[in-house]
Design a protein with these regions (language model features):
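Extracellular, repeat-based ectodomains that mediate carbohydrate processing or recognition
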Residues: 1-149
Length: 149
């Protein structure tokens, strides 16, 4: 599986990837932090327990100097490929959320994310009306809530 990397905070690096540790289920999203010159820490599962019963892959990550860290991936928990995400808050990963606009009818796959200088989220992904259909690139801008600034 492909590893995605992002710096966040003052000197932290986070790696995220899809990992098939449980041979009975599909891939899950894992991550690990590297602080400064230290080695990567323990692996943690990024997606929540509910997501553990479904396949996830194509992890992407975005970090910000203010400490924000978001991981997004392709997820099949609602019966089709959609973009889901989680963010790091007080050292714990949030419950997973389907990305509004990148879930529902059709196939939403291969997300890519970044945080701009204000901490606003930008997301692009591949959309298909059906599996194997022609592809379209979709984009979503999600401003950070004003109380979070």
């Amino acid at each position: 599986a492909r590893v995605a990397l992002a710096y966040y905070g003052n000197s932290s690096l986070y790696a995220a990837w899809a990992d098939k540790r449980d041979f009975r289920e599909g891939y899950d999203i894992y991550g690990a932090t590297k602080q400064g010159d230290q080695a990567f820490g323990s692996n943690v599962r990024v997606q929540d327990d509910f997501g553990a019963n479904y396949r996830q892959w194509h992890a992407t990550i975005a970090g910000h100097p203010n400490g924000q860290l978001i991981v997004a991936w392709t997820d099949e928990r609602d019966g089709s490929k959609d973009v889901w995400y989680s963010w790091l808050e007080d050292g714990e990963w949030s419950d997973d959320l389907a990305l509004s606009g990148a879930s529902g009818k059709g196939v939403q796959d291969h997300p890519s994310i970044t945080l701009d200088s204000s901490g606003d989220l930008h997301v692009a992904w591949v959309h298909r009306e059906n599996d194997g259909g022609p592809t379209q690139i979709r984009y979503l801008y999600a401003p950070l809530e004003s109380d979070d600034r």
